[in-house]
Design a protein with these regions (language model features):
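Acidic/histidine-enriched alpha-helical segments
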Residues: 51-52, 83-92, 178
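Short, well-ordered beta-strand elements
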Residues: 48-57, 81
Length: 210
């Protein structure tokens, strides 16, 4: 999964192309070696201790965090302290930057880069929890918002993606994709036309044909 897009989006880079990029290879060996080298160059050849790992109090997130904790220790000798908090408290701490490491909660209303690029990565984006700022990326956003030609927008998206790869705002972990199902007597739902889960989906017209 790329930094910039949902992997199931029409804007996403094809999987075979993504696999050629550093950090997206099928096996992690090369990435781990590079990470160790970068840590050594930064003065942490022996690893890190006491990293504050902020995690929302939810079974699936706790499980992911524990797995990440083990992988960081085994691969890079980075020791983290899990700090479990209620979901509401997590948002407060995340917005305030009170963490060293956390599993984010980025979502969007539309499957369009104008929506999620501004929300996730713009200077004052509501979900830019790392407070990331890149001037070149910021200049691309209004161009992307105004461009109506899809091919030209794809070019802008690739440019934005290249900037994110050179200067990562975050590390992608996973995307949630939900499959919809309904009884045949429920009429009108068309999953192709909506996106998201309970917080963004609204059926304006639906009926039961029984």
């Amino acid at each position: 999964m790329a930094l910039s897009d949902y992997p199931f989006s029409v804007w996403s880079l094809p999987t075979e192309e993504l696999a050629k990029r550093r950090g997206y290879q099928p096996t992690p060996h090369a990435s781990i070696q590079e990470a160790r080298q970068l840590l050594a160059e930064a003065g942490y050849a022996k690893g890190l201790k006491g990293v504050d790992f902020l995690v929302r109090e939810a079974p699936d997130l706790k499980l992911r965090a524990e797995a990440i904790q083990v992988m960081l220790k085994e691969a890079l000798n980075v020791e983290t302290n899990l700090r479990l908090v209620q979901i509401s408290a997590w948002f407060d701490d995340a917005q305030a930057g009170n963490f060293d490491l956390t599993i984010g909660a980025i979502v969007s209303t539309l499957m369009d880069p104008s929506d999620y690029f501004n929300s996730w990565y713009s200077k004052d984006g509501p979900q830019n929890y790392s407070k990331w700022h890149n001037e070149a990326f910021q200049r691309l956003l209004p161009q992307l918002d105004r461009e109506a030609d899809e091919r030209k927008r794809q070019v802008l998206v690739r440019q934005a993606e290249d900037l994110l790869e050179q200067d990562p705002a975050l590390l992608p972990l996973a995307w949630l994709k939900c499959n919809d199902a309904w009884y045949t007597y429920v009429k009108c739902p068309n999953p192709a036309n909506f996106f998201g889960t309970y917080d963004v989906v609204r059926w304006d017209t639906a009926w039961l044909d029984k």
